[in-house]
Amino acid sequence: MMGSGLHIAARRTVLLFGVLLGMLAVASMVGTKTAYASTFTVNSTGDKGDQDTNNLVCNSTPLQPGIDPECTLRAAIEQANDNDNEATTVDTIKFSLGGDGVQTISPNTGLPVVFEPVNIDGYTQPGASENTLAVGDNAVLLIRLDGKAAGFASGLNIAADDSTVRGLSVTRFSFSGGIGLSGADNCKIEGNFLGTSPRGTTAGLGNGFGLYLQNHFANPSDSPLANTIGGASPEARNVISGNSTGITFFGGLENKVEGNYIGTTKSGIDDLGNSARGMEVLAETRDVSIGGTGAARNTIAFNGQDGVGIPSADSTGSSIMSNSIFSNGGLGIDLGASGRTANDPDDADTGSNNLQNFPVLSSATTSSRSTTIKGTLNSTPDTIFTLRFYSNPSSIPDEGKKFLGLKSVHTDATSGEVSFTFRPGKKVAVGQRITATAAELDSNTSEFSNPRRIVAQQ
């Protein structure tokens, strides 16, 4: 009997241990659900919301055995918002919509604000592909988000850090913006057409803002930080054209705008201008980086007003580097009040980008072998500045169409004056107009200088 009792006790112990292990396993599964990213695949262009945001299944219609659930973009965003993932875990929204060609999603009201990190990837739609061209854009976009029926709403409003939106055409959110970032940090907006159809050439489909960045609507002290619009590789290029304004910063710190076409068709050459500014930096926005080297340079052209406008006195530190800026209705770069801001002695004034003084070009000559550009800069004494030089055709002389190169100079400690001579790597044709900008290293870029016509060297 004792042996039998011990045997039964042992069996109970093993059984209890097994039950405990099972409970721990279940508890572990429940406790670690948040450690795994979820993927939701949009398979319907409809606009119904999710039936049950607690089941980790995107289903905008009741679940039926043996039938794949319908998943709309609205339902997918609701699931991504409510699946209890950790803030460091990024969900993915993919697309697999039946039918050939472009699939259009037309919400009847604004889509939910994105509160949890998510990667919304239009290039997952079968047949879509990223841009591979260094010049121009051959991306195949097959998902269009159209706001004609959405009322006063943005196409997508991202309020979650570490989110990405790529591969979408976003059109006709005319009362607001195509994509908004509200207090979100470290997000990427890349490979989209904002304000034009997936063809990348169609006018009349613009948003109020192609893209806007603003402080968080529930926490105004939370500014968007370190987001990248575009990027330095071909697949990251956005076409932001045909809107009222291309990109607007209503706040933010250390955001980047790189490699985009702002105001052109996807060719990067033809006119599809935004009706107002190509880009505007407002309301305590600081340290925006616009452009860069190589593929990070933006093309900003054909916009109805300024190419880049920084009117707000409390918006400082922005760098506008090596872009192609031309054929805009206003100035290529406009600081402060509308129109050219005059230089002042030692650049003692303050305001947007500190109202940085621009260089004064005294001569520009071309010989049979080279081009020589001379001039002066008067600005903050004993300070290192980066000068950037551009050439322009005579028909559009006073912006910066073709970047020629840069030069560092150091102003005199007493007078704030420095003279310079710059020779670009390739000679510039007689008749071209030269302009230049000045920046404190790579901060607080000035307006373009007055143009100087290239003449033959005697």
Model-inferred region functions:
Residues 26-190, 196-207, 234-242, 269-273, ...:
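N-terminal, post-signal-peptide segments of secreted/periplasmic proteins
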Residues 1-38:
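Sec-dependent, cleavable N-terminal signal peptides
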Residues 160, 184, 215-216, 224, ...:
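Small-residue (G/S/T/A) turn/hinge positions that recur once per unit in extracellular repeat modules
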Residues 179, 189, 194, 211, ...:
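Fold-core signature of tandem repeat domains
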Residues 156, 209-218, 225-227, 277:
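Long, polar low-complexity repeats
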Residues 281-285, 311:
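Long, low-complexity, polar and repeat-rich extracellular regions
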